[in-house]
């Protein structure tokens, strides 16, 4: 029986809050389910919608001026969403509406609304780099790694890009300046800030409040365009979310990291924006070349990779005084693979205090072995390295999420050997350890190399889990 609650049965204040919000007297079930949400509901009810409408209009004028929509349409969409609960009777949908409205009323002003007020002066901090001098070296390095054979029968997943990306990029440039303690960028846009000749698509970001930011941005886009916006979570990418429109076109994505991880990520300051240190990005690029898919990307567009690598090589030459003379010493470090147990042993004693590194290709196996070691000093850098690291009894234990390329049966390809070395160097940088000699040898080991065909490769670790999503239009949250 779905009776209305007796006014004398429930506390009048809570009942009144829920009644005002729903625009009707709640049923007994609605009251009991929603009473613990009374505080959030009250915040939503007293929220000044007129000020919010004004902020969205200002965001539209500044970042989405080319989108054909009127001020009255924006206002109608906002007021319609904030009254949606009055026509909703499903408890699950009501909870979703309350949660998303709560995010808007408590965070939008500080996260996106602030972008409409006068910005602090930009501190010009660019250094002139002679990238041209590194282009030939980068091309030589990449040419020796351009060994993937493209299977023309292989069906490649299409990455459709929304026309709104350019608007969101404009917003993100300002967002990165205003929120540079909680959000940093990497990838092509960050390198563009060093070398304006770099081409970039969307802006790659790491931040500490990814979910909240993406929800606020999704609503901004919805209110301006009227389109249904969906946020998706991918299980095999740690703390990753992406915004897509109703036609599955990519708008922006983001990785979320803890503040303590953000604090140790090496970064540099350019024009009021923090970017991941290009040295760190170069190591990540070398690491990623162990992934067969990335080598296929290199084969399709070598010049794109060349521009990026030349920029990063010039940065490390200028910043660290790296001399490119071909002296490689013990790089890449010796790597022996146990294909049955899916563990690669890297001999590290020539460079580091730990004598070897056991690189696991299955994360669950590593987690189990760490438990058996009864060690509690492991470091988890989340999506920054996509791995945990532990040093115990002079042995490093870590996980490698990419494929391992083989140049012959049981023999690790030098591309993967360098990738494993780069993975270890990422740890050294994150923990303020010694890395510069090793970095110099690693980069020099990439010079004057012949192409070595790929014999085979290991499979990537299979990640369990299901896709999650937030569908604003349908009032569904699945995580």
Swiss-Prot record:
Q: What class of enzyme is it?
A: transferase
Pfam families per record: Pox_polyA_pol, Pox_polyA_pol_C, Pox_polyA_pol_N
In which residues is Ca(2+) 1 bound?
Answer: 202, 204
Transmembrane segment boundaries: none
Keyword match Transmembrane:
no
Entry binding sites for Ca(2+) 2: 202, 204, 253
Q: Which residues form the active site?
A: 202, 204
Biological process, per Gene Ontology: mRNA processing
What domain of life is recorded for the organism? Answer: Viruses
CDD domains in the record: polyA_pol_Pox
Matching InterPro entries, A to Z?
Answer: PolyA_pol_cat_Poxvir (IPR004976), PolyA_pol_cat_sf (IPR037265), PolyA_pol_nucTrfase_Poxvir (IPR024231), PolyA_pol_nucTrfase_sf_Poxvir (IPR038419), Poxvirus_polyA_pol_cat_C (IPR024397), Poxvirus_polyA_pol_cat_N (IPR024398), Poxvirus_polyA_pol_cat_N_sf (IPR038337)
Asked if the keyword Zinc belongs to this entry, the reply reads no
Q: Can you name one GO molecular function term for this protein?
A: poly(A) RNA polymerase activity
Keywords attached to this entry: ATP-binding, Calcium, Early protein, Metal-binding, mRNA processing, Nucleotide-binding, Transcription, Transferase
Q: What is its EC number?
A: 2.7.7.19
Quickly give the catalysed reaction.
Answer: RNA(n) + ATP = RNA(n)-3'-adenine ribonucleotide + diphosphate
Description of what induces expression? Expressed in the early phase of the viral replicative cycle.
Q: What does this protein do?
A: Polymerase that creates the 3'-poly(A) tail of mRNA's.
Q: Which family is this sequence assigned to? A: Belongs to the poxviridae poly(A) polymerase catalytic subunit family.
State how it assembles. Answer: Heterodimer of a large (catalytic) subunit and a small (regulatory) subunit.
Record-given protein name: Poly(A) polymerase catalytic subunit
**Species assigned in the record:** Vaccinia virus (strain Copenhagen)
The upper taxonomy is: Viruses, Varidnaviria, Bamfordvirae, Nucleocytoviricota, Pokkesviricetes
UniProt lists the gene as: OPG063
